[in-house]
A protein has these predicted regions:
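Terminal, compositionally biased segments used for targeting/anchoring and flexible tails
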Residues: 2-107
């Protein structure tokens, strides 16, 4: 197997890991009761959650969602975008944009 093919396979596997569900011990419990198991769950939750709920998980001291994305899902790029997402709608857009990009990487 060629070096390029091996790299392409690894990139696909890495992308699939970012989009996969996390283990039971790593799920994220939102203030409003929603349970997040994947980036897709995060996207759906952000589209439905109240701005007040988002504020419980994101402020100048707390960045719960970006920490979960970085440390559990493993997506450093998205985590950095979420750190700067001062509103729920911006966070929802960042997650949807990242998911669309990752989906295109899987043939």
């Amino acid at each position: 197997m060629g070096k390029k093919l091996k790299q392409k396979i690894k990139e696909k596997e890495d992308t699939q890991k970012l989009l996969a569900e996390v283990t039971q011990k790593d799920i994220f419990h939102c203030h409003d009761g929603q349970v997040l198991r994947s980036m897709k769950d995060l996207s759906n939750a952000l589209s439905m959650m109240a701005d007040e709920t988002y504020a419980c998980h994101w402020n100048t001291q707390k960045k719960d969602l970006s920490n979960w994305v970085r440390n559990i899902i493993g997506d450093i790029k998205l985590a950095m975008e979420l750190e700067g997402a001062t509103s729920r709608s911006l966070a929802a857009w960042e997650v949807a944009t990242r998911m669309a990009y990752l989906d295109r990487q899987i043939p």
